[in-house]
């Protein structure tokens, strides 16, 4: 009877037993009559041990001549070893080669250092590296945690369209698509549509791709990214801030609990993630402006920030670096925000909105607001922004038939992954990043 098939992630359940692994050769070391092949299977990496005197000559030679990324089925006995990265090694008894990578055309990504451009050209192979695989597993955990958070709190998943007839916030950064004899656009946000489903279902969220034709080359920008967007009927700004605080805390805790090994493999300082617990600091836009102006006076910021402007990346980085938790900046000037945001009744020049800035200088990961409930005021804002009123007729209907205070926010998955994993650039947060200068592979 053949040994049971298992995964490297589950190998600890089989200590002292013979098992079968199906995967690829990740790396190889040799020391005299001992071979130390490293195998990966998508769930992790384990070191095998092959003493020449413990296996047949054919098996020893087969392992010795394995090339990097050759696909293999390995049989061996699981042995606990505290020195091993995962706490276990595999005493190899037999190896079946499924496909041997040809020596004449070797795997291009070797253990040596490679430039970013080379790695991006070979992204379809780069994702196999230990670091990239760990990042993608953390990404999957974040997405699962987000869904669990909303599902457990009575939210209904709803799916807004990818092809839209109009922009959520203007057309300057939209990707146009020919839609038969009409002009359509790839969605920038599902928000307007999930406002409609929130009026039907109460508490909803969407999760899907969004597209921004921004000609930005910063470490924070992708042209295609994934966003989760909750929307809640009968919600005001404080409710939304509480919800965002709960979501972030839940997601980070889940990653600490379930993806600690992957975070360690990436080199993340997990002690910084241990601090992500409610309550989060909340500061007004006015307080943020004062803070930024003091930073400029001290020489920490090149440009003096003036009241009325939107926060740029250097401003977000400066502010968020002062806190060891996400900081919530609320009530921005309405003129720098989207047309649909509810004005502050105390100061109508401000919008009831919030941006959540991740610590360690990572900047905005969530942006949200209370939505405008008044039909007349929304019509006025659409006109002020020079938007086509006819295109928003259906959206205005929501204010005619049982309008209520409501709101929501969007959280970019890639920026959340970058922060939680401690990454320099968002290009590593998604399997195949789309950027200003990157459409391949």
Provide a role label for each language-model segment:
Residues 134-138, 185, 236-240, 280, ...:
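Catalytic cores of large soluble enzymes that bind and process phosphate-bearing ligands
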Residues 99, 251-255, 424:
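Conserved NTP-handling cores and scaffolds of large molecular machines
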Residues 3-233, 418:
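Class II aminoacyl-tRNA synthetase-like tRNA-binding/catalytic domains
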Residues 160, 167-173, 247-361, 384-404:
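Metal-assisted phosphate- and nucleotidyl-transfer catalytic regions
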Residues 235-245, 289:
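Extended, domain-scale alpha-helical bundle/helix-rich regions
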Residues 199-209, 218, 222-236, 256, ...:
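TRNA-recognition modules of translation machinery and tRNA-sensing kinases, especially anticodon-binding
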């Amino acid at each position: 009877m053949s040994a049971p098939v298992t995964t490297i992630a589950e190998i600890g359940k089989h200590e002292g037993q013979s098992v079968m692994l199906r995967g690829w050769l990740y790396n190889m070391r040799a020391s005299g009559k001992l071979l130390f092949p490293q195998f990966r299977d998508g769930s992790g990496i384990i070191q095998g041990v092959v003493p020449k005197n413990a296996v047949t000559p054919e098996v020893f030679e087969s392992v010795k001549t394995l090339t990097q990324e050759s696909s293999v089925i390995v049989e061996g006995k699981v042995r606990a070893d505290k020195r091993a990265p995962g706490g276990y090694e595999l005493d190899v008894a037999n190896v079946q080669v499924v496909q041997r990578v040809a020596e004449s055309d070797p795997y291009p990504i070797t253990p040596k250092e490679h430039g970013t451009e080379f790695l991006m050209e070979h992204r379809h192979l780069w994702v196999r590296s230990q670091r990239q695989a760990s990042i993608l597993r953390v990404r999957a955990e974040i997405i699962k945690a987000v869904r669990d958070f909303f599902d457990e709190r009575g939210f209904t998943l709803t799916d807004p369209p990818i092809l839209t007839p109009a922009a959520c916030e203007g057309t300057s950064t939209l990707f146009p698509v020919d839609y038969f004899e009409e002009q359509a656009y790839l969605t920038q946000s599902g928000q307007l549509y999930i406002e409609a489903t929130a009026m039907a279902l109460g508490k909803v969220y969407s999760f899907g791709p969004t597209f921004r034709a921004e000609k930005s080359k910063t470490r924070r920008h992708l042209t295609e990214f994934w966003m989760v967007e909750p929307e809640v009927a009968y919600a005001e700004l404080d409710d939304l801030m509480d919800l965002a605080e709960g979501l972030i805390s839940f997601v980070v805790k889940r990653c600490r609990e379930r993806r600690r090994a992957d975070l360690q493999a990436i080199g993340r300082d997990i002690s910084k993630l241990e601090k992500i617990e409610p309550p989060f600091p909340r500061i007004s836009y006015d307080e943020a402006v004062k803070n930024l102006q003091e930073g400029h006076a001290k020489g920490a910021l090149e440009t003096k920030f003036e009241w009325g402007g939107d926060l740029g990346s250097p401003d977000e980085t400066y502010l968020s670096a002062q806190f060891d938790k996400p900081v919530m900046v609320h009530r921005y000037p309405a003129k720098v925000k989207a047309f649909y945001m509810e004005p502050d009744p105390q100061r109508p020049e401000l919008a009831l909105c919030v941006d959540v800035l991740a610590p360690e200088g990572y900047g905005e990961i969530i942006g949200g607001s209370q939505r405008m409930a008044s039909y007349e005021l929304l019509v006025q804002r659409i006109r002020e922004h020079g938007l086509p009123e006819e295109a928003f007729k259906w959206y205005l209907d929501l204010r005619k038939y049982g309008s209520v205070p409501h709101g929501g926010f969007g959280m970019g998955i890639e920026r959340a992954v970058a922060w939680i994993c401690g990454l320099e650039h968002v290009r590593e947060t998604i399997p195949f990043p789309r950027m200003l200068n990157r459409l391949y592979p």
